Each structure stands twice: as C-alpha cells, then as structure tokens.
Amino acid sequence: MKQLFILDPIELINPAKDSSAALMQAAHRASLDIWVCTPADLQAKGAKARVVAKTIVPEPWKSLGEAQNLSLNEFHCIWMRKDPPVDEAFLYATHLLEVAERAGVLVLNKPASLRAWNEKLGALRFSKLMAPTLVASRVNELKEFAKEQGEVVLKPLGGKGGQGVIRVADAALGLDALLELVTSQEQMPVMMQKFLPKVIEGDKRILLVNGEPLGAINRLPKCGDFRSNLALGGQAEATNLSKREKEICEELGPSLKSEGLFFVGIDVIGGMLSEINVTSPTGVREVEKLMNIPLADQVIERLLANFS
C-alpha cells in the first residue's frame, strides 16, 4: 500500500519531536510504501493530478530515493501535513488534492475541510463549549468586549504555535493602538477571548483519530508567560481526561468524523475548548513518551481499517 506525505521540506523535520515523522515510522513498521513531497511538488495535467515525490525509509531516519513523477491515483492514501500558515499556496494544494480525491484516493485530512475549518474559527461551531469569544475588526467593538470581560487574549486568525497571542487588560494603556495594529487598521478580523486564569494549570492537547480521543498531554507555560505551546518553551506532562474533557470530545467527534477530519488536535483550557487543529496536529511524540501509548501505530491501525 502506497502512502504519500505532503510536508514542509524534509530537511527541516526533527524526527525526535515531529508528529509526521512518527506517523511515517509507524507506517514503515506496518510495511507500507512511503513517499514524501512538498506542496510545490503537486501538479495537474488536464484532469489528472500528479506529483514529483521521493520514496523514504524513515527508520532509522532517513533514506530518500530518487525523485519520480507519479500520478496521485497510484497512492492509496495521501497525508496533507504541511504546517500553517494556510496561505494561497496551501489552499491551491488542497484544490489539487481534490482532483485525486474525486478519483477515489483517500486524502487526510479532507481538502475541503482543511479550507473550511480555520483553526481558530472552526471552534465557533461549538461556541457553547468555549470561553466568551468575539471575532471582529472594529476597534470600538473589541474595546467594548474587553471592557465586559476585564482581561482578554488576542489571537491572530492565521497564527500557529502561540505566535502573536497577546494577553491584555481592558484598561491597558495603548489599547487603541494595539487593536489598530493587530487588525491592520480595522481591515483584518482578530479573535478576542476572555482570559482563563486556569491556563497556568496547563493547556491540554487532546489528539482525536476518526472522532475518538486516543491520547492527551498537559502543556504548562514557562515561567513568566501564559502561553503553553511547546514551541514557545512550554513543558509537557502526563495527564488523563476529565469528565468535562471527555464530554467535549463526545460533542466534537461525530462532526469531525463526518467532515473527513481523521487526525485532529484540540486544545482545552480549564474545561473550555480553545482551538481545533486540523492542518498538521502535533503532540504524538509527547503522548508516546509521557503516556506510554504507541499512538502513531494506533493511528495507522485505524487508517488501515478503512481499507479492510
């Protein structure tokens, strides 16, 4: 069985930490034929989608074959694992992948859903599970919401890994100037959420496969910061799901599955849904290490069940 992984340049991947590397190594252990490429390697000739890809032996890391020009129809499964930002190049890649999808190739996650589920805005489908949230461009509306909530967090809609996330009080000096900056002079919407003090106890990353939670870690912010993202120095610790967190997964699971979002990471703070990560969820290595769960192998097992 042939699987294609669409990634950032392979040279940038740290196999000790990277979830895509973990998935490729699990696929290798399952005796699957693995290929890699970047979004720039995708193409369409008429109504047929193609790719310039290389074989990879990911364990031990790594051995690459020569580049070959192949039809995407040759692959049983294609993983779209390019990290954000979801820019024009990313969006065009999803359209090219839909050509293969229409020909019967399984694409994970579903291209149309990758476009539709912005990692900040997608959570609004489940707003009752979230902290009070406003998405707006107008400074006056954002200031009024901040006044109502007292202390808020600003999030750029296209950000990743906690980049650009700002904690601010409603009476902060220079708030107008800050809001003008983050909204590009009221031309770009931004997400504003009530600040949750429980973030100091951790931000839980829960990984769902086909709508079911298979593993989780708790991420603690580094000293002097409220952001717990591992990329910003947060520390991961072992954890179990609370009753509330299980309820959140049960609420989200059917929608994720029906939308073709096979592999998803959700973030929960103090029992409140924060984000739904669908593009290239991380955390596999940490779950495997801290929880002693062969998560990547379980993901591939669930995938192969689709072909049995």
Curated annotation (Swiss-Prot):
The keyword tRNA processing does not apply. Mg(2+) binds at E275, N277. It catalyses: gamma-L-glutamyl-L-cysteine + glycine + ATP = glutathione + ADP + phosphate + H(+). Gene3D superfamilies: 3.40.50.20, ATP-grasp fold, A domain, ATP-grasp fold, B domain. The gene is gshB. Residues 120-304 form the ATP-grasp domain. Keywords: ATP-binding, Glutathione biosynthesis, Ligase, Magnesium, Manganese, Metal-binding, Nucleotide-binding. It comes from the Bacteria. Binds 1 Mg(2+) or Mn(2+) ion per subunit. The lineage of its organism: Bacteria, Bacillati, Cyanobacteriota, Cyanophyceae, Synechococcales. The keyword Nucleotide-binding applies. Belongs to the prokaryotic GSH synthase family. One of its GO terms (cellular component) is cytoplasm. One of its GO terms (molecular function) is glutathione synthase activity. Its EC number is 6.3.2.3. Pathway: Sulfur metabolism; glutathione biosynthesis; glutathione from L-cysteine and L-glutamate: step 2/2. This is Glutathione synthetase. PROSITE patterns: ATP_GRASP (PS50975). ATP binds at residues 146-202. PANTHER family: GLUTATHIONE SYNTHETASE, RIBOSOMAL PROTEIN S6 MODIFICATION PROTEIN. HAMAP family: GSH_S (MF_00162). Its cofactor is Mg(2+); Mn(2+).
